[in-house]
Amino acid sequence: MSENEPAQMIEGRYRIVRNIAEGGMATVYEAIDERLGRTVAIKVMHTQLAKGPHREQFVERFRREANSAASIANPHIVQVYDTGEFNGLDFLVMEYVHGVNLRHEMNAQGTFSVRETLRVVAETLDGLASAHRAGVVHRDIKPENILINDRGHVQITDFGLAKAASQATLSSTGMLLGTAAYLAPEMIENNQATAQGDLYSVGIMAWEMLTGKVPFDSDNPVTLVFKHVHEDVPSVATVCQGIDPSVAAFIAHLTARQVDARPTDGAAAAEELSQLAAKLPLEAWQYRLHAEPIGGDHTDATAAALVGNIAEQAPLTGVPAGAATFKPSVPAFLADDVASNTVDTGGAADVNPPAPPVAPTTALDSSTPADASAPHKTQIMAQSGSETQVLPQAGDAFTRALAFSDEPDVASNGTGPKKQRSKKPLIIVLVIVLVLAAIGGTAGWWWFAGPGSYWSVPKPDDVTCDANASTECSLAGADWATYESTLKALGIPYKTHKEYSDDVAEGKIISSSVNKTKAVVNSRISKRANQELTVVVSKGVRMTTIPKDILDANSANGKDPLNALKKAGFDNVKHDESKDEYSMDTPQGVALTISPDPGTTAKHNDEVTVTLSKGPMPVTMPNIVGKTQDEMQAALGELKLTANVTEQYDDKVEAGQVISASQEAGAQLKWGDSVDVVISKGPEMATIPSGLVGKQESAVTKTLEGLGFEVKTDKVLGGLFGTVRTVKSGDTDLSNGGKIRLRDANGNPTVITLTIV
């Protein structure tokens, strides 16, 4: 870091000796505290972070590390001595620790004995007990953050994620911080940091020390965290079948899925372990599962210690060739000889494991770029909220082995050949400049163009992707509720809208896109462009209801039933015009029948069958003139025509026969039409009164003509007296009265002949 060249002074007190390591968040230097005359480690924040858009978040975390660690006095916690700001960059002054971290030892040994494991756990719990008493929750306990100093004792480092227990909930940035393989379920689900969460991480770490692997492992970090949330940690005895049940029970107590099922804090867990140790038989202490060392030092930079130059490793690029390397002595607790207590366990335990090689590691900040070989990566995942900005992935790499030259440092006062002294400072400066330039460039690329500039669309757990298939892996069919939790956990911004689907079940994903382009597994969502994942979620098959009044000819739905069904949302309405029927009562176009019944709720694509009315049937008027009334009624009734009957006298048509109709034969009518029909009453009759004989001609004539008859007279002897002697109609004698036709067949008045004397 060019801001702090070797031999440079910070605040007139701390003289930089050399660059120990580079991280994604800060550079760590070995320095001399000129005031107290002791070696310290100084962590200085990178310029691009201190002046970047997320400065406040990084500075908050940087200062939190100082405040959290400084508030705890415990030999098992790396101490922070001082903090400040130099040239606009925050820095921490920390204890300079000689040793290695636990990850290095785990990689070297593979597995540990119960004795070795419980010793590390006991000292870790002691340190956490002090932290918990001070109201501080670490939040990122893992092997990378557990240092084994050169005296063989545990020291916990990296309190950059720590928070006060009273405030250990979702941070203002909405970020979930921690290492996926060791995170407690409540941290994953609610970002709720608890003392019990630290114990859960200790339990997972112990599980890994004994078995050589973590209980949950997956290449997909989302799958990993969901296993922690939804599955119980299996008993360590499932792998270490010869382990003492009380040890397995203790680890199970630490790793219980429910918060309340774990010890309350570090002190309670330490007391439980103390009671366990007092009763544990000798052979139980010696148990060790055989496992091959992982090989290589893949120590996580997030959790490495501030370590002194107690050993050298293969040099980094740029370090002068020929730098000496050597292995330090094994840490005390790992080298203790227990051979005198050897018990034959049938080969199940290795009571005297070989001393592992050790190498120095250097405490970097939690943003060190990831080592590709790291099996358990720290994940940074944002909670819901579209405004949340996810910071560069913190602490997801394993600390790289760093080599330090055993030649005199440029800041030392050692004497040597002048020629060597003139070259070495230049080489070291060039190395520092090149390494820092590379790291700075890499960090810049990572954040602005590389993986830090985008999110990758995660694979749903319930979707199977064929790695050998040429087609892309779609999100379609995945359960949205589960996948939404995944997006929230990863901090991926998203929006949804719901649609009905005939093929995709309710609550499942129909499609996904980013910036209107189809999104599949591993598609990129740009942070720089403020992109978000758009997910279309199925509401299932659309349901709709047949209107209850659809058969009511007087309702709006009844008058146009097909359109009513369309408006209701039915897409599969079956109407066959050839099956429509004529109806006397139902107007044309109104539904006669519908299946299913009105008021039924069904899928929008279910078949709905409708039969419409064609209205009254057209008919042809029959010829009914001259028909009897019964014959007329039968003819019209068959055609569903209505007869309006009237009667009248007719001198030509017999009584009871049809004289006429209002509609001519052959006229086009329809069912229900009315026809006016005139029925004959036959010829009109008139009654001639009796007593006409003997009356005067004039009076009788007047009476008969008044009835409508035509009167003729036949006078005898000239009708001298003018009186009526007989009354006749043709041959019919009506002198005594009688009833006769008023007219003849031609409509002429009937002639009445009077004989006058």
Swiss-Prot record:
Top EC category: transferase
Residue numbers annotated as active site: 140 (proton acceptor)
EC number: 2.7.11.1
Entry-linked Gene3D superfamilies: 3.30.10.20, Phosphorylase Kinase, domain 1, Transferase(Phosphotransferase) domain 1
Statement: the UniProt record of this protein carries the keyword ATP-binding: yes
Ranges where the Protein kinase domain occurs: 14-274
UniProt-annotated binding residues for ATP: 20-28, 43
Protein name: Probable serine/threonine-protein kinase pknA2
Organism: Bifidobacterium longum (strain NCC 2705)
Gene designation: pknA2
